[in-house]
A protein has these predicted regions:
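N-terminal capping segments
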Residues: 1-75, 81, 86, 93-95, ...
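A broad, low-specificity signal marking well-ordered, structured residues that form hydrophobic/aromatic
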Residues: 15, 109, 136
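Short, solvent-exposed coil/turn linker segments
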Residues: 78-80, 123-126
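Residues that flank catalytic or metal-binding motifs in active/ligand-binding sites
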Residues: 86, 107, 134
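Short leucine-rich amphipathic alpha-helical surface patches
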Residues: 91-94, 115
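Catalytic Cys-His active-site segments of thiol-dependent hydrolases/isopeptidases
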Residues: 101-123
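Intrinsically disordered, low-complexity, charged/polar segments
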Residues: 124-145
Length: 145
């Protein structure tokens, strides 16, 4: 399942950013990227409804962690950084809440995410650029393997 999550996320690389976008090659947001990837590989319950997470700027004005609440409702559980494996999910605190989400690609901290400047792309989730120094929370949708 972990490899399937990473493989599906890679198929979105190069898709431009679009707030709440959902079409591969046309436009995707960070939240919809994660939702569509985990839905495609059936890592969330069948029939799980599409999230109604945010207005794109909610993290700037609200302390509610709506994306985390949604992932937990799908069966996600929080894990320690030492437990993180490829295919897990990382949330970054941006503004007042955890308003950015990405998929862990490898043991080195590489993630796939979607941002306005680069669209769906790779980034190092801890050491460089937009994501460096951000408070992080990690979650998994995968049971014991």
């Amino acid at each position: 399942m972990r490899a399937a999550i990473v493989a599906e996320a890679k198929t979105w690389i190069g898709t431009p950013y679009k707030a709440v976008g959902r079409i591969k090659g046309v436009g995707i947001s960070c939240a919809m990227l994660v939702y569509l990837v985990v839905r495609a590989v059936r890592a969330i319950p069948e029939g799980a409804t599409e999230p109604k997470w945010y207005s794109g700027q909610v993290h700037l004005n609200s302390t509610e962690d709506r994306m985390i609440d949604c992932l937990v409702a799908y069966g996600g559980r929080e894990i320690a950084e030492a437990e993180v494996r490829p295919g897990d999910i990382v949330f970054y605190k941006t503004g007042l809440s955890f308003g950015h989400i990405a998929i862990i690609v490898d043991w080195l901290g590489t993630v796939i995410h979607a941002i306005p400047k680069n669209g769906c792309s790779y980034a190092h989730g801890t050491r460089e650029g937009l994501l460096s120094g951000k408070l992080r929370r990690y979650f998994t949708l995968i049971g014991d393997e």
